Amino acid sequence: MSTNFNYVNYLWDEKKATSLGDDQVALFLYRSNILGADLRITNYGGGNTSCKTIESDPVTQKDVEVMWVKGSGGDIGTLTRSGIAGLYTERLRDLKKVYRGIEHEDEMVALFNHCIYDLDSKAPSIDTPLHGLLPFKHIDHLHPDALIAVAAAADSEQITKDIWGDTMGWVPWQKPGFDLGLQLEECLAQNPGIRGIVLGSHGLFTWGDTSYECYINSLEVIEMSSDYIEKKIKANGSVFGGQKMTSLPKEQRLSQAAQLAPILRGLCSSDNQMIGHFSDDAVVLEYINSHDLERLAPMGTSCPDHFLRTKIAPLILNLSADENLDDSKAVREKLTPSFEAYKKGYEAYYNDHKHPNSPAMRDSSPVIILFPGVGMFSFAKNKQTTRVASEFYINAINVMRGSEAISKYTSLPRQEAFDIEYWLLEEAKLQRMPKEQPLSRKVALVTGSGGGIGRAIADKLIAEGANVVFTDISDDFLKEATASYSTDQAIACNCDVTSKESIDTAFAKASLQFGGVDIIVHSAGLAISKPIEDTSQADWDLLQNVLVKGQFLLAQSAAVVFRKQNLGGNIVNIASKNGLVAGPNNLGY
């Protein structure tokens, strides 16, 4: 059994696995975590994994088979015991007796709770029957880019046979749920001995008798599809119809993105304020610079996990890569018609496909925005969500790349996409999300936040839900101040408030990371305690530059970003008690 792979990471640590002994649940969790660590295998929150064990029924004291499966809303990369559901396998299979057909699909979810074995279980997900109706001890349901490329190809079933022969099954697209579980069961009955099943426009199911065998089987199947795609790309000589244009140099791309991000943020925040993210990943640039961009992008994504986070299609900016962005008002006026058209298109999509009981239409602004020659922006309610949306669209690009190489890419019909996006079960999941904090969707830049009052203010802003850019002249202080935060919460930037160039760099970094800035807190300061006769002109100038000129420069740069966003803003200058009653030798006040 080979452990050498070119397109996926082999992460199984035999020493770690051995330390888990024969604890099959622990081994299933370990497998889940290492699968989720490779975004080529499955994206954040996507896919699910399971195992089946023999346990003692607490009432009858008889041995029963229990299925342990990732619960609703979890992520296999970080899955723990508290994130799984334990269900009686036989009782779950008995639900076939009460299943009333696909039009009553959603009522089955409530019945999963009547199959619970472990009373500490996470809520079972909609994919629970897909695992329960298959007999295997360990099962992986994954969303690898290469596999979805096969699943989304126009002749997906034939390509499945071309790659794996008779060792893989195939089922056409079906919304996740009990009916899809029945289709998998039937596929296995018709094709005994297969190693897995390709789900049309969706993903992959693989299995094994042990956690390790399941893991290796998943990697091998993904490797085979990846190898098939890459050989086709090599034979074709190009992807996406070749390159229509070239990207700007890296430094210029970042400069354009930093200038444009606050304008885009404002346009995307017409209904609800958003946080931004920017990517100029090589995969993104290859796609947005290609001849096929205008054909493929409007088609929309295929895998449900993708468009649930990215919306069905992106907005492509009608700007040249080297567009002069100095006049933000003119740029906004140029872009506004595109945003209005996108929003009207989304409203039409909703109205054309909604059902009488559909949830209310959500924000109609684009999530993904493509700027040919520069990169990709994403906007959502918080940094983690917008970053993940960007990652998911990169997954979608990889899927289109693979499908186009081996066949023709096909997206889900709009009605199918709508029925997933506005599924009542998805809406219920959204309603269970924690309530937003007072400063959620806000970005703050705090000077002098490497320590002291500035750091305390920055910490408080984060605690209230804001994203924060910590700035200071000490890299060591900044490193310590931000050590406990992820980059989804805060970033650090060395900034000298006496230098306009340094301040502008901090705002550019904030714009690239979060899309802009809403709150400025000027807390940078210093004290020079000397008698007047010992105070030099340089001392005096430094005090005035930091305490007075710094406020002016900071406010001036903030105003530029605030005007670009057109969302207002707040500037807070921290004053010293010495400004009212100066202490001894504080002549600067």
Segments the model singles out, each with a brief description of its role:
Residues K442-N467:
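Canonical Rossmann dinucleotide-binding motif of NAD(H)/NADP(H)-dependent dehydrogenases/reductases
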